[in-house]
Amino acid sequence: MIKASDFGPDFLWGVATAAPQIEGAADLYGKGTSIWDSFTNRKGKIKNNHKLGVACDFYHRYQEDIALVKLLGFQIFRFSISWPRILPLGRGEVNQEGIRFYHHLINECLTQGITPYVTLYHWDLPQALEDEGGWTSFSINAAFNAFVSICALEYGDKVKNWIILNEPFGYTSLGYMLGIHAPGKTGLSNFFPAVLHTALAQAEGGKILRAEISQANIGTTYSCSEIIPYTQSENDLLAAKRVDSLMNRLFIEPALGLGFPTADWDLLEKFQIEYGTWRLNDRMKFDFDFIGLQNYFPLTVKFNAFIPVIQAWEVKAKSRKKPHTAMGWEINANSFYNIVKQFAAYPNVKNIMITENGAAYHDKLIEGSVVDAERIEYFELYLAALLKAKNEGINISGYMAWTLMDNFEWAEGFNARFGLVHTDFKTLKRTIKYSGYWWQEFLRN
């Protein structure tokens, strides 16, 4: 049985959240409309037509929730600053009530001995900017840079740990190519410009923080999945390379000064030629202090000529009779180890933090308790895999569990429960699950 002490005395343990998923107060206290506010109001976009609305009401209950972070024994609380809460129209006039809220939240963390890790963009783009094209518009970069600068000047004396973007592949692919997340756009004509402007934003945001906050610890996060070919046929191997270049390499390689990974996917080569991205390589490069990795599942893929764009198809865990979570995501701790090793192999990756990792299950509150033994087993498996990678010499400085409490899980609405704490979405009562108590004991020892 692994122990927290096995990771060493300097290893950091935390729990992660995101503003649009927990805050609530979606149209209160001067906050502007976000693309997720708009998207959830479109019928059929979210399971059971759930809307953000109150969410977990973290805005009014943050003291209670920070107390839970402390009670469970975590050192770090990762949260995001809502862009439309600070700048209701995305630029221009600042909402002082929003500014005050995050001052209060940061102060509460510090008072409780919790280190805040602040994410600057966790998918809640102001709708006013989306009306101008959102991430497909070149003007988005100036607006984002101004937002970053405001946050740095307001909070930089109290917050030293910053994350520029959360999972850029997630919001560009799901929101601007497949249309299943906000803002619901589709096609490569939206996806490629969003990719380019996002790659610029992650670097330029880092440069602003570096200039404005002394001793800042600056990172950004990437979703990552080991891509496994279904067979060793040439077609499946090439399909896996294409998917890997898209899902794992698309944003980290520009940040490392390598440009976009065009070698294994001809459409990326065409994108580079059309947009002249090689001319922007220096602007897309930034020397991050840490890279945040967010892993939930591997992806097994096979060649399929009828799938547009990527000519690859996922072979689901269930069809391969592999263990999986309530989301259908394969449980494979060895693939977690493999993908950490893959990212660590880049010469310029100095430090890795696991900024999200967790699992959704069909949790039930029965007689005041949530017995989520499957989630405990999941964490035991994945932490053992992480320790193996760390013991092999990879510089891994911390781990953040996703997530503190059940919340709004994007297109899944309130159906997918990832929390260490159960949320009753009718009463908003919090109940620590067995997995939360497991973490408490793990960190105590």
Model regions and ranges:
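Active-site region of glycoside hydrolase catalytic domains
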Residues: 1-46, 89-91, 99-445
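Glycine-rich, proline-tolerant flexible connector loops at the mouths of alpha/beta enzymes
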Residues: 81-94
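A common structural microfeature
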Residues: 10-12, 59, 76
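N-terminal, well-ordered alpha-helical segments
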Residues: 60, 67-70, 100-103, 107
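Catalytic domains of carbohydrate-active enzymes, especially glycoside hydrolases
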Residues: 61-82, 286-290
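Short secondary-structure transition/capping motifs
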Residues: 51-58, 91-98, 140
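Aromatic- and Gly/Pro-rich amphipathic surface segment
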Residues: 33-67
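A short acidic, glycine/proline-enriched capping/turn motif at secondary-structure boundaries
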Residues: 75, 84-86, 123-125
